[in-house]
Amino acid sequence: MPTNSIKLLAPDVHRGLAELVAKRLGLQLTSSKLKRDPTGEVSFSIGESVRDQDIFIITQIGSGVVNDRVLELLIMINASKTASARRITAIIPNFPYARQDRKDKSRAPITAKLMADMLTTAGCDHVITMDLHASQIQGFFDVPVDNLYAEPSVVRYIKENVNYMDSIIISPDAGGAKRAATLADRLDLNFALIHKERARANEVSRMVLVGDVTDKICIIVDDMADTCGTLAKAAEILLENRAKSVIAIVTHGVLSGRAIENINNSKLDRVVCTNTVPFEEKIKKCPKLAVIDISSVLAESIRRLHNGESISYLFKNYPL
């Protein structure tokens, strides 16, 4: 049964997405204070009563400070639980440790499962995320998980900002072929595939194009951009095969390491990321970066969850 009131919480840093969501819902972020003492320990307090309230905690987790953001989120969840909130939903658009979803070598942990366990132990009742790197992570939880998709927002962006009828959708690897094919079908476009062989993580040794991109605007789609070395090499391969131009659209712009340098020095015309990850400072250093705002999708998911409505509408449709 829906609760009587919504409370939105966000950490003191990287509140941009949370503020956009709150504005779309016509709400204010609930007063709270998160402090870090000289020893590095974190304390958190909520500035008003949340008893019997429907709590939504919105966090953006990017590169460099992942563990700090995770611990802050766990503390905020637990604080809400001990303050007698009726339901606590963690909105984590970029789910941390999603690439550690399986035991890929001896004595390796499955850290994505550990993340799920910690969230539920802290008191989380529901999780909303976006474009999980591995969809099976939903099965790690003992509470409901809604994995939203950036695809409707991406389709809208392409139709409004790209001459898409003269385009082709590109998958940067075999694993993303289904994503690329689905997007291509929605736009009634062809798609091509780049087969890549990795020498080690984040280092591609060879790339082979499967498909014809002659005189086409190539739109590379992926769930995550990390160091962007793969995207830069993909752009070179596509242009060598007579593509007209190349842009990349990714859900999670982690942009770690030399990502900005790689983008600036690449033959990519544009790299478009959603704001699941905070990268406002990086945009100032890279004129090729652009943003797709997904706050409307998150706001509508909150409204629907609070009112007991289906969220599956958002899997294929942009919020009205």
UniProtKB/Swiss-Prot annotation:
Biological processes, Gene Ontology terms: 5-phosphoribose 1-diphosphate biosynthetic process; purine nucleotide biosynthetic process; ribonucleoside monophosphate biosynthetic process
Residues that hold Mg(2+) according to the record: D131, H133, D142, D146
Pathway involvement of the protein, from the record: Metabolic intermediate biosynthesis; 5-phospho-alpha-D-ribose 1-diphosphate biosynthesis; 5-phospho-alpha-D-ribose 1-diphosphate from D-ribose 5-phosphate (route I): step 1/1
One GO MF term attached to the UniProt entry: ribose phosphate diphosphokinase activity
Subcellular location per the Swiss-Prot or TrEMBL entry: Cytoplasm
EC annotation from Swiss-Prot or TrEMBL: 2.7.6.1
Superkingdom in the source lineage: Eukaryota
Family (UniProt): Belongs to the ribose-phosphate pyrophosphokinase family.
PANTHER family xrefs: RIBOSE-PHOSPHATE DIPHOSPHOKINASE FAMILY MEMBER, RIBOSE-PHOSPHATE PYROPHOSPHOKINASE 3
Protein name, per record: Ribose-phosphate pyrophosphokinase 3
Lineage: Eukaryota, Fungi, Dikarya, Ascomycota, Saccharomycotina
